Amino acid sequence: MLSLFITSAVIIVVIQMLFFILAAYFKTDKVTDLSYGLTFVIVSWVIYNNSLSYGHANFVVPLMVTIWGLRLSGFLFVRILKTKKDKRFDGIREDFLKFAKFWLLQGVAIFIIMLPAIVGTAKDGRTFGAISIFGFLIYLCGVITETIADYQKFMFKSDPSNEGRWTNVGLFKYARHPNYFGEILTWWGIYIFAFTTLDGFEYLTVAGPIFITLLLLFVTGVPPLEKAYEKRYAENKEYQKYKNSTRLLLPFPKKIL
């Protein structure tokens, strides 16, 4: 198992460095998010081809990762083609070391998030019991939620009449960041699906879903958006009303839960 972790780490670093070279040379943001989802997909199938055993159950894990990864990469690529640039990299893409640091940290994040998927793909010691089914349903809810939320926000932002407005349609009527809720659910679902194969130190792969949860809640996801919205709409009473009447993540009316 250790060799598979090492193999995964090496592949992740190689992929990230290749995309970094492209992004740095052409001074482009178009490959950044594309590389993120694709790295998960590539690593999953490499691990499957080198897995400790082959079976129906461990085939499902890379399939789950692939559906999530290709969907996310495709969406982000279409979005960056429309927006032309990613504001996150303003002042960074021109600085070689800072830009390289971002790609390195992205590689580290991918490895940590992937931990349960690596084990779940490499081992086939389970049947499709209640835990696996529950995990798959959680995953499915996550992917569907993230897909719907991304589509709704993209379409809203694509409408010129919504210029300067915050997204408040569909799932966003109930939560300000339902897409992040979907992504968190996705990775907890993958961990739960793989749970019955875990043994000993492998239970520590729970670090994967914990990491993505904390990352989105406290670092790269929610905080910068909340800060930007608060700054932009600080004097807007309608936004403050919207903020106070919605949840942060969970896309349900407050009256329900």
Q: What does each of the following model-derived ranges do?
A:
Residues S3-T7, A24-T32, K101, K173-P178:
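Short, amphipathic, aromatic/basic-enriched membrane-interface segments that mark the entry/exit
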Residues L4-Q16, T39-G69, I113-Q152, K157-L257:
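Hydrophobic transmembrane alpha-helices
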Residues I12, Y25-T32, Y54-V60, T83:
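Generic alpha-helical scaffold signal
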Residues M17-T28, G74-L81:
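C-terminal ends of transmembrane helices
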Residues T28-L38, K84-F102, R165-F172:
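Juxtamembrane helix-capping/reentrant segments at transmembrane boundaries
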Residues T32-L34, L97-I110, R176-E183:
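Select subsegments of transmembrane alpha-helices in polytopic membrane proteins
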Residues S35, S73, V108, I144, ...:
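Active-site His/Glu-centered metal-binding helix of metallohydrolases
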Residues A57-R93:
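A basic- and aromatic-enriched beta-loop-alpha substructure that forms the phosphate/nucleotide-
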